Amino acid sequence: MQRSLEIARLEAQIDKNWDAYQKIPRRKFIGARTQEYRFAQYIEDWRIKVERIGNLNYPDEARRLQIYGKLQLSVAIRADGSVESVEVNRSSGHRILDAAAMRIVRLTAPFSPLPPDIRKDTDILVITRTWTFTSSDKLESE
């Protein structure tokens, strides 16, 4: 009898753990050199939009003070195109540029919803890119 109760308790715990596990979002991490075809067009469209908005909103203070540099940024995009998070992985060394990159992501959002072929196994797409604020006052992403 005691053994049956213990087995039932363990089965209930396993079910609870499994349910919790199923609720964890499936994340896919993509860098600049991704080889998977199904991500290529989405990433390219994302890059074009970010650079267009970034160049329209290039930080005036950086331009005025002639501050240039590179930083690495990760942007987590939900399936509906909204931004879950933005994180500076490697700073440019200039607070102005790091803050500008995060601001540009917020201005650019929302992004296009993830296409069905990506959504089939991805709930959150994390795009990591190097952003360069150039001496010609342009934003480039690689």
PLM region descriptions:
Residues 1-30, 51-54, 78-90, 99-113, ...:
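Conserved "boundary/linchpin" sites in short secondary-structure elements
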Residues 4, 8, 33, 37-44, ...:
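Soluble non-cytosolic domains of exported or imported proteins
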Residues 45, 57, 100:
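Short Gly/charged-rich anion-binding patches and loops
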Residues 58-63, 117:
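Surface-exposed patches in mature extracellular/periplasmic domains of secreted proteins
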Residues 67-71:
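Short, small/polar residue-rich loop motifs at catalytic or cofactor-binding pockets
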